[in-house]
Amino acid sequence: MKRLLVFATVVALTLVASGLLLAQSNPNVGTWKLNPSKSKSSSAGLILRSGTRTVTAQGDGAKYSYEGIAADGSHVGYSFTTNYDGKYSAASGVGMPGGADTYAVKRVDPSTFVGTGKKAGKMVGTNTTVISKDGKVATITGKGTDEQGKPTSTTTVWGKQ
């Protein structure tokens, strides 16, 4: 019984330590607040009034969750999980850019991530996230189409909390 308890404790500590190491090696992990005054878009209404971006280490990748208030006052809340392997996974919620229903992310280098969204199998957008050297700012530049098929471009700036 004592051996089983020691074994279970070692396994639990190993899992916690590996999760902490992954979080430390991924500067994207954390909670980020949108800075609307430093953000811009090609058309009115694409930048949120306020927003929180939470990236949580999960396995070899991360879970991304977004919550905020759109320019028109409506609620935005969506999430997706990625293994940073470029494979698409389901996105759920409301307000996903371009109305994407699947999303994929690849890690280009330690501080750069490229994501692509598809709706019904058709590409609707791509974005690049770059984390600053000090790890305090994430700048996301995106290009795509809105739900009416019009081209869009955005740059959003997020501060780490």
Task: Describe the predicted segments one by one.
Residues 1-6:
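Positively charged n-region of N-terminal signal peptides that target proteins for export
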Residues 7-8, 32:
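Short helix-onset patch at the extreme N-terminus, typifying the N->h transition
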Residues 8-19:
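Bacterial N-terminal signal peptides
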Residues 22-161:
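Hydrophobic small-molecule pocket/channel-lining residues, especially in calycin-type beta-barrels
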